Amino acid sequence: STGETPNIFYYPAIAGLKEWAQNGVLLDLTDSLNEDEEWKNTFLDGALDTYDLSAYGVDGIYALPNELNVDAIFYNKALFEKAGIEKTPETMDELYEDIDKLVAAGITPFGVGGKNTWVMGHIFNNILAKRIGRDGIIKLGTGEKKWTDDDVVECLQITKDLKDKGAFAEGFEGMDYNTQMNQFLTGEVAMISHSSPIIPEMFNSESEILDDISFFAFPYFEDKPEYK
C-alpha cells in the first residue's frame, strides 16, 4: 500500500503473485536463469515449472523455490495394529474403512488443528489434488474454475463427510497446530495430515512413540486413478 517493496520476500502461494507480476512489481527471472546455466541447474528438474506464471496468464518466472516438501499422512503403527489395520490405505475407500475400524476401537483417527486454516488445508488440498488434479487447481488460481463448480464443491463435501464419520478429534475446530501435534505425539490420535518439514520437529521432541511413527501417501480415488 505504501508503494515500497522489499528486494526479496517470501510468499507461500504462487497464484497470488499474478497481480503483482502484471503490475510490474516483480522481476521476471527468466533471462537471468537462462544466462546462468550453472545457477539454473542447481534446481531439480521441473522445480522451476511450478513458478512459471504462464499458466496464470503472465509469461515469465517470478519466484524461486526455497525448499522441497512432501505431503503425507503420518500415522501411529501401534494404534493401527490395535484397531486391526494390517496395511496402510492406498485408496480413499480403504481410508474410510480404516477410519471406521479406528472409531470402533475407540481411537480418534485424525488430529486436526482446525483453528489454523492452513492446517485443515493439508487434508482439503490433498482431496482437491486427488479429485481435480494439478490443472484443475491452476484453473482455480486463475479464476477459470470457480469454487462453486460441482467438482470443487464435491471436495468440500468429502471433507465434511470425513468430519461426519468421526475422523477428526472432537472439538477440532477450536484446536490449533500445537494441540494437534501434541495429540499425535502423545498417542491420542492415530494420524495427522502434514508435510515433511514437521519430521525434525517430531524427532526432536521427547515423544515416547517415535518408534511407532511412519507415513504413507495421501490415498487416491479409484475413479480418478490419473491423479494417483
Segments (PLM) and residue ranges:
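Short helix-initiation/N-cap motifs at beta->coil->alpha
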Residues: S1, A15, M92-Y96, F172-L185
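Extracytoplasmic "Venus flytrap"/periplasmic binding protein-like
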Residues: S1-G46, T50, A78-A83, K87-E90, ...
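Extracytoplasmic/periplasmic substrate-recognition and gating elements
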Residues: T2, K82-A83, K165, N204-K228
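Beta->alpha turn/N-cap motifs
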Residues: Y11-A15, Y177, H194-I199, P219
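Hinge/lid segment of periplasmic solute-binding proteins
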Residues: I14-A72, Y96, I123, D151, ...
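Short, solvent-exposed loop/beta-turn-alpha elements that line the ligand-binding surface or hinge
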Residues: T30-G46, G114, R131-E154, N204-S207, ...
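Extracytoplasmic/periplasmic solute-binding protein
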Residues: L53-N66, D71, Y96-K145, K160, ...
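Glycine-centered hinge/linker elements that transmit conformational signals in sensory
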Residues: I99-K101, G141-F172, F218
